[in-house]
Amino acid sequence: MSSGKIAQVVGPVVDVVFASGDKLPEINNALIVYKNGDKSQKVVLEVTLELGDGLVRTIAMESTDGLTRGLEVLDTGRAISVPVGKDTLGRVFNVLGDAIDLEEPFAEDAERQPIHKKAPSFDELSTSSEILETGIKVIDLLAPYLKGGKVGLFGGAGVGKTVLIQELIHNIAQEHGGISVFTGVGERTREGNDLYWEMKESGVIEKTAMVFGQMNEPPGARMRVALTGLTIAEYFRDVEGQDVLLFIDNIFRFTQAGSEVSALLGRMPSAVGYQPTLATEMGQLQERITSTKKGSVTSIQAIYVPADDYTDPAPATAFAHLDSTTNLERKLTQMGIYPAVDPLASSSRALTPEIVGDEHYEVATEVQRVLQRYRELQDIIAILGMDELSDEEKTLVGRARRIQFFLSQNFNVAETFTGQPGSYVPVEETVRGFKEILDGKHDQIPEDAFRMVGGIEDVIAKAEKMNY
C-alpha cells in the first residue's frame, strides 16, 4: 500500500504528492487519510486527475475540515467498494457503504463490490416488453412503465416528484413484493428521514435498501452516491437474478454535483456552465441501469427541471435515455389535481397495441384526443363562454373535465396530510372506468364526484353521498 502526503487542500479538492519512484494510484482509486492521525476520523478521497511529478488531484467524499498539509495519505489500491446482498435490505448507507441508521454496525467481512463497473455487454441484455402495474391511474393508462425500463419524473420545485416516488415504492412493495433500492442524491435530509420512518412503520423497509448523499454533503459524495445505489441494485440483478426497482431522487443533483466537481478541477465549462463531460457521465450511469438475461433493474428517476425549462442541458441529456416520461405540471397542482401528471405531455414507448392490448390502447388514445380538443376549446370558452359551443362540444367538454378529475387519486403515503385513505387501482379497472366515461355512462354524475377517488365504483359511491 503506497503512501503520499497532502500537498494542498482547496475545499473538497485535495492534492496528494507521492515520492518519486512510488507507484502512483490509478484513476478512481480510493485513498484514505486520517485527520490528525486519529483512526476514528477517516476521510476517503477519490483520484480524479494525475498531474505529473508524483502529484494526483482527488475529490473528498467527506468534509475536509481538519485536513492539513503534510498528513499521510494511504492508497487502498482499489475503487470505493460498498456492501451488497440481502443484508443490505432494511438498512441505510452513505456513499461509502457505511451504515448510518444507528442499527447494528455492518459486518466487516460482508461482501463488497466496487462502485465503478462497466455496463453489461450487448449479448447479456434482455429486451422483454412487460408492463409494470403501478396502481396509479394516470400512469397506468397514458404512460405505462416497462419492467426493466427507465422512467423520468420531470417537474419543477414543489410539484410532487418525491411524493410520487414514495407512492410507487409503497405500491410496488405492497402489491408486487419486489426489492427496491432508494438512492437520495443531493435532496433534503428531512425528506430522507421522513421516508425512512414511513417505510419502517409500513414494513416496506424490509424489502428496501436506502443510500443517501444529501444536500449538505460535499459534491464528490453527491456525484458518486448514485453509483453506490446502482451497485447494490446490480448485485440483486446479476447474482440473485431478481427484478429490482431503483429509485433515484434526484438525477439533476447528480449532474449538479458533477458540474461543481468539474469547476473545482478547473475544466472549461460548456453550455449554461455545465461540465463538458455531462453526456459521458450521464451515459456511464444510465447504461448500467438495464435488464439482462438474469434479471432486471427498472429505474424511476425524479428529474428537477430548473425554472421549468425543459431545454436546460441537464434534463435534456437525461431525456435521451428514458423509455417513459411522467411530466408533472404546476397548473394542475393549482387546480388541486394530484398527482399533477400532465396527461398530454407524458409519454411511453410501451403505449402500443402490441404491449398493452387493443382496448387499453384505444381508450388511452381517445382520452388523449378528448383532452387535446378540450385544451383547444378553452380559449373559446374563456372569451365567449360555454354558450357559443355546439351541443357536441359541450358534451365533449363535460366528459373531458370528468376525465381530468378522474385522473387524480389519493395516495397512501399522503394519508397523514390529507386524512383520506389512498387507493391502488388495477389496470383493468382503470381502463374500464375511462371507457365508461368516454361512452357517456356517467354524464349525469357531478364533476366533483370524480375528484380524488380510486375506481369508477368510488365515483358512484361519492355521488350518492352528495345526493345528486
Swiss-Prot record:
Its main location: membrane. InterPro entries: AAA+_ATPase (IPR003593), ATP-synt_VA_C (IPR055190), ATP_synth_F1_bsu (IPR005722), ATPase_a/bsu_AS (IPR020003), ATPase_alpha/beta_chains (IPR050053), ATPase_F1/V1/A1_a/bsu_N (IPR004100), ATPase_F1/V1/A1_a/bsu_N_sf (IPR036121), ATPase_F1/V1/A1_a/bsu_nucl-bd (IPR000194). Gene3D superfamilies: 2.40.10.170, Bovine Mitochondrial F1-atpase, Atp Synthase Beta Chain, Chain D, domain 3, P-loop containing nucleotide triphosphate hydrolases. Produces ATP from ADP in the presence of a proton gradient across the membrane. The catalytic sites are hosted primarily by the beta subunits. F-type ATPases have 2 components, CF(1) - the catalytic core - and CF(0) - the membrane proton channel. CF(1) has five subunits: alpha(3), beta(3), gamma(1), delta(1), epsilon(1). CF(0) has three main subunits: a(1), b(2) and c(9-12). The alpha and beta chains form an alternating ring which encloses part of the gamma chain. CF(1) is attached to CF(0) by a central stalk formed by the gamma and epsilon chains, while a peripheral stalk is formed by the delta and b chains. PANTHER family: ATP SYNTHASE (PTHR15184), ATP SYNTHASE SUBUNIT BETA, MITOCHONDRIAL (PTHR15184:SF71). Belongs to the ATPase alpha/beta chains family. This is ATP synthase subunit beta. It comes from Streptococcus agalactiae serotype III (strain NEM316).
